[in-house]
Swiss-Prot record:
Enzyme type, top EC level: oxidoreductase
UniProt protein name: Acireductone dioxygenase
Native source organism of the sequence: Erwinia tasmaniensis (strain DSM 17950 / CFBP 7177 / CIP 109463 / NCPPB 4357 / Et1/99)
May play a role in metal incorporation in vivo (site feature) positions: E96
Reaction catalysed by this enzyme: 1,2-dihydroxy-5-(methylsulfanyl)pent-1-en-3-one + O2 = 3-(methylsulfanyl)propanoate + CO + formate + 2 H(+); 1,2-dihydroxy-5-(methylsulfanyl)pent-1-en-3-one + O2 = 4-methylsulfanyl-2-oxobutanoate + formate + 2 H(+)
Amino acid sequence: MSALTIFTESEATTPVWYSMDAAEMAEKLGSKGVRFERWQADRDLGDNPDPETVIGAYQHAIDRLVAEKGYQSWDVISMRADNPQKEALRSKFLSEHTHGEDEVRFFVEGAGLFCLHLDGHIFQVLCEKNDLISVPAGTPHWFDMGSSPHFTAIRIFDNQEGWIAKFTGDPIADGYPRLP
């Protein structure tokens, strides 16, 4: 189940706030400019769907965001435990970084952990199937897919280039809880 855990920047072992209630999560994240919503990922995609199948199944959701925010491109990221690149990708995503655009993800299956570095706190957002998260441009963050990843998410972009990270060099991500 989706969850939001908040830590202070100086204390990575004891949370100061926790909730699994989507409305509470949306309110707390919204106060920081982060969009969090529960959408319906109700299409049967099979065991290992190709990107075209995922896009086709959720084109209506993509169209809604494009109409609302003017996004220009989208793709699908899908990761499974048997992917030979999983360790390299996990390592890359675990380094704190920012983007020059919003980072928008709609989870259509599985789960992943977004960790947002905001105002002296770390907001850990466990996103699961049905979750839409939009992290504002310039927000320092990292993403953990776990050591045995299983997720499929639609990524939506402001530009045609797709995912472009600017790494901060801050090792803060190393001290916070990760997915198993």
